[in-house]
Structures are given as structure tokens and as C-alpha cells.
A protein has these predicted regions:
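Cytosolic, long alpha-helical scaffolding segments
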Residues: 1-205
Length: 205
């Protein structure tokens, strides 16, 4: 499931960076495959609860896996959002805004969170959570840059860069930043559930 979701996210980010509309449509069309896989694994978790009645560490593992599935499915939904923005927004107007650094950090956080889950690495869980502030800071700076560029270009170009002409693009670009930040939030959720699974520690939950 995580590999499928990461593939969708990678494709969405690449489409966004290169303004590849065909790739963006492929991401959107592929969401059904993610949803089907999610439902299959959700059913498996429910069956384990009902038939095996896990306790202690086994119970924490199944419960954490169930929650993590939901986070991964939501990341896939965010990838669809990013693909949709590729089809709708004019990135050329805000080419200076670096979304790649935000996307790279969010993806690394998600990768590390899943590695922590697979390897029972509590320290890595805490590292993922600690990087959330860095991601938030990148997102904040990007959002400020978008607004500043809008103001500066409107002042310089007058009617040629009227606010009403670019308001939709500004809104969508801010939504892109927000959704990338949410990918990081879901990575932190995965890390938190994993830490609880490993140590029965609700520190990050």
C-alpha cells in the first residue's frame, strides 16, 4: 500500500513540476486502484480483530496498521489534489516559488515514517515528528512568497497583472502548499502510531 501511494505521490509531484497534464490525468485515474487496495487491507484488519482477538503488542500492531492505512489513503487523495491543480493552475506566473523543496521533505518524512513502521525504529519515529517544524516553516515561507509576488507584480504591472486575473492561480498555489504540508502531517501520524505500537507510548499521538 505504501509503495502504491508513494508512486502516486511521486507522479503527482513530477507532473506539477513539469506541468505534465497527461501524467496528472494518470494520477487521477489511478486513484481507484489505491481505494481498492485500501478496502482490501481494511477488511484484513477487521478480520484479524474479529477472528484472532489480538492482545497487548499484537493488538497495538493491528490497531496501528489500521490507522496507518487511513493516513496512506489520505495521502493518495492529496496526490490526486496535486494532479488536479496541475490541470487548473498557471504555474508560470509563480515560477519562483520553490515547491520541490517542500515536496521532497514531505516525501522523506513519509518514507522514514514507513521505514520506522517496518523496522520498529522508535528513534526514527521521533526524528520524523521533529522535522514537522521544518516543513511548516518551508510552507509558511512559500505562502508568504506567493502573496508578496502578487502584491509586487500588481504594483509593477498595473492592469496587466490585475488581481482578479490571477486570484484563482494564487488560491490554487496556496492549496498546493497546504496539501504538501498535510502529507507531512500524515507522515507524523504514521510515526506517532508506530511509536505507540512499539513502546505503548502516546507521546506523539
Amino acid at each position: 500500500m505504501s509503495d502504491l501511494v508513494r508512486d502516486r505521490l511521486d507522479r503527482a509531484l513530477a507532473a506539477l513540476e513539469t506541468v505534465d497534464e497527461a501524467a496528472a490525468r494518470d494520477v487521477i485515474a489511478g486513484d481507484d486502484a489505491v481505494d481498492r487496495r485500501y478496502l482490501e487491507l481494511e477488511s484484513t484488519c477487521i478480520q484479524l480483530f474479529a477472528q484472532q482477538q489480538p492482545v497487548a503488542g499484537d493488538l497495538r500492531f493491528v490497531a496501528a496498521s489500521f490507522k496507518i492505512l487511513t493516513d496512506l489513503e489520505r495521502v493518495a487523495d492529496l496526490a490526486v489534489n496535486l494532479a488536479q491543480y496541475t490541470l487548473e493552475a498557471d504555474r508560470k506566473r509563480f515560477a519562483e516559488v520553490d515547491l520541490s523543496a517542500i515536496g521532497d521533505l514531505a516525501c522523506r518524512m513519509l518514507d522514514d515514517a514507513m521505514t520506522a513502521y517496518r523496522t520498529d525504529d522508535a528513534a526514527l519515529c521521533r526524528e520524523v515528528a521533529a522535522r514537522d517544524d521544518e516543513l511548516d516553516s518551508l510552507c509558511q515561507r512559500a505562502s508568504e512568497r506567493v502573496v508578496r509576488d502578487l502584491i509586487e507584480r500588481e504594483a509593477a504591472d498595473g492592469d496587466g497583472w490585475a488581481v482578479e486575473r490571477v486570484l484563482d492561480d494564487v488560491s490554487r498555489l496556496l492549496l498546493i502548499v497546504r496539501d504538501l504540508e498535510r502529507v507531512g502531517d500524515h507522515a507524523v501520524n504514521v510515526a506517532a502510531r508506530t511509536l505507540y505500537m512499539i513502546e505503548s507510548d502516546p507521546e506523539l499521538v
